[in-house]
Amino acid sequence: MNPSHIIKLFIGGVVATFLMAGAAQAADQGSAAEAEAMAKKAVAFIKANGPEKAAEEFTNGKSFKDRDLYISYLDFNGKMLAHGSNPKLVGKELMELKDPEGKFMVKMAIDVAKTKGKGWTEDYKFKNPTTEKLQEKAMYVERVGDAYVGVGIYK
């Protein structure tokens, strides 16, 4: 076999390995469309079942968790009503919560919910609960009464 042919096969194998690894990682992460769908499902659940039952389901149930997607449910004062990944955050006032670059994550989400009713925040950094690493993230938020639900995607 020609040495240049062997090198081309080797390089092709390396490229294929990286592509498959990237596809596997993408499959482990929720998409923007999936985040929006989960948020809309959460808003419908709140309207059908009330905020208390919804908060319990978002925090402790399984129907609003999918890979790295989960619900954050906060009032417009920044109080965490439910959190699908970290129940210790429930009841905490998080209005002043900043990412490592100084971005006020909750304030950004409240601004989108109040001014647009629904939409995406700008990117910020947050610890991914599945990888335990700090990653870029954006959150889709949707207003429900004087609160909002949010579902973020890691990038």
Place the predicted regions along the sequence by residue.
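N-terminal membrane-sensor/transducer module of prokaryotic signaling receptors
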Residues: 1-155
